[in-house]
C-alpha cells in the first residue's frame, strides 16, 4: 500500500467509517423523529440532509474524541491502534479534518430553517465538550445521551418549525437507552479505564451495573411507549416495543458475567433493537395509510 493510500486508510479509520455501529445507533432515533414529526411522510430533502448529517457528525465526534484521548488511548488495549494514538495521523491533520467536516455539516443545516441552525450550534458545542467530560465526571454516558439525542429536536424543528412537547418523550427514551448501551460499552474498558483515570458510569455503578442498566432500559421502554402514544401509533409499533424488550432481556443475559467479549456483544446488539423500533414505526404508519 502506498503512503497516500495508508494515509487515507488512517483517515477512514479515524472517522470510524470502518465501524458503522455508532452511525446506526445515531440514525435509528433520528429517523424515528422524522417519521413522528411528519406523521409518517418526512420531506425527502430533509431526510437526505439528516442521513448525511448523521454520518458526518458521527465522524466529527470520533475525531474530537480521539484528539481528547490521544495520550490515554495508547494505554488501553482496545484503543492503542487508533490512528492518533499510534501516530498514523498528526494532531494538525485530525483537527483540520474535524473543521472541514464540521463546516460541511453546518452547510447542510443552512439549507433548513433558522431554528434548526440554532439547534445545530448547540449540537456542535455538545459534541466538542463530551470527550472531556470523562476527565471530570463519573457520568460521561449521561452527557453522551444528550449529544446522541440532539438530532431528535432538530428533526422535529426541520419538519414542523418547532419542537413540540411530544418530541421530548422520544428524546428521553433515547437518552435512557444511550446511557444503558454506552454503559455496556464502558464495561468492556472498565479495568483499563481505572488504570489510566478515565471515568464512566460502568465504574460509578460498580457491582450494581447490571441492575442500573436494567433500570435505564425500563425507563427507555416507558418513554418509547409514551412517544408512540403521543404520536397515536398502533399495534405494529407496540410489537416493535415488545421486540425492544426482548433485545434488552438478551443484553442483560450477555452482561451477566461481565466478560469483555459478551459486554461488547450486548452493546452491538442495540443496533438490532433500534432497527426493530424504526421498522415497526414505519410499518405502523404504512399500515395506517392503507
From Swiss-Prot:
The keyword Membrane applies. It is an enzyme of class 2 (transferase). InterPro entries: HB_polyprenyltransferase-like (IPR006370), Prenyltransferase (IPR039653), UbiA_prenyltransferase (IPR000537), UbiA_prenylTrfase_CS (IPR030470), UbiA_sf (IPR044878). It is found in: Cell inner membrane. The keyword Nuclease does not apply. Coiled coil: none annotated. It is a multi-pass membrane protein. Pfam families: UbiA. Pathway: Cofactor biosynthesis; ubiquinone biosynthesis. It catalyses: all-trans-octaprenyl diphosphate + 4-hydroxybenzoate = 4-hydroxy-3-(all-trans-octaprenyl)benzoate + diphosphate. One of its GO terms (molecular function) is 4-hydroxybenzoate polyprenyltransferase activity. One of its GO terms (biological process) is ubiquinone biosynthetic process. Keywords: Cell inner membrane, Cell membrane, Magnesium, Membrane, Transferase, Transmembrane, Transmembrane helix, Ubiquinone biosynthesis. Its EC number is 2.5.1.39. One of its GO terms (cellular component) is plasma membrane. Belongs to the UbiA prenyltransferase family. Catalyzes the prenylation of para-hydroxybenzoate (PHB) with an all-trans polyprenyl group. Mediates the second step in the final reaction sequence of ubiquinone-8 (UQ-8) biosynthesis, which is the condensation of the polyisoprenoid side chain with PHB, generating the first membrane-bound Q intermediate 3-octaprenyl-4-hydroxybenzoate. PANTHER family: 4-HYDROXYBENZOATE POLYPRENYLTRANSFERASE, MITOCHONDRIAL (PTHR11048:SF28), PRENYLTRANSFERASES (PTHR11048). HAMAP family: UbiA (MF_01635). This is 4-hydroxybenzoate octaprenyltransferase.
Amino acid at each position: 500500500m502506498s503512503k497516500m493510500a495508508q494515509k487515507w486508510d488512517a483517515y477512514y479509520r479515524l472517522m470510524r467509517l470502518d465501524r458503522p455501529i455508532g452511525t446506526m445507533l445515531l440514525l435509528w432515533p433520528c429517523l424515528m423523529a422524522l417519521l413522528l414529526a411528519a406523521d409518517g411522510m418526512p420531506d425527502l430533502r430533509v431526510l437526505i440532509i439528516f442521513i448525511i448529517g448523521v454520518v458526518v457528525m458521527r465522524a466529527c465526534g470520533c475525531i474530537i474524541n480521539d484528539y481528547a484521548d490521544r495520550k490515554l488511548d495508547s494505554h488501553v488495549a482496545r484503543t492503542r491502534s487508533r490512528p492518533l494514538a499510534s501516530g498514523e495521523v498528526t494532531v494538525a491533520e485530525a483537527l483540520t479534518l474535524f473543521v472541514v467536516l464540521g463546516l460541511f455539516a453546518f452547510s447542510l443545516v443552512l439549507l433548513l430553517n433558522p431554528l434548526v441552525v440554532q439547534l445545530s450550534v448547540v449540537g456542535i458545542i455538545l459534541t466538542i465538550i463530551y470527550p472531556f467530560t470523562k476527565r471530570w465526571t463519573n457520568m460521561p454516558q449521561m452527557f453522551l445521551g444528550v449529544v446522541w439525542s440532539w438530532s431528535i429536536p432538530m428533526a422535529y424543528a426541520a419538519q414542523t418549525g418547532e419542537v413540540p412537547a411530544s418530541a421530548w418523550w422520544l428524546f428521553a427514551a433515547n437518552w435512557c437507552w444511550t446511557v444503558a448501551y454506552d454503559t455496556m460499552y464502558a464495561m468492556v474498558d472498565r479495568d483499563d479505564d481505572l488504570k489510566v483515570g478515565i471515568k464512566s458510569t460502568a465504574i460509578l455503578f460498580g457491582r450494581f451495573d447490571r441492575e442500573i442498566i436494567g433500570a435505564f432500559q425500563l425507563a427507555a421502554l416507558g418513554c418509547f411507549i409514551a412517544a408512540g402514544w403521543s404520536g397515536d401509533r398502533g399495534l405494529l409499533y407496540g410489537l416493535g416495543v415488545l421486540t425492544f424488550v426482548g433485545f434488552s432481556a438478551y443484553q442483560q443475559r450477555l452482561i451477566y458475567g461481565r466478560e469483555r467479549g459478551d459486554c461488547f456483544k450486548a452493546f452491538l446488539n442495540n443496533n438490532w433493537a433500534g432497527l426493530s423500533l424504526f421498522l415497526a414505526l414505519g410499518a405502523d404508519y404504512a399500515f395506517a395509510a392503507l
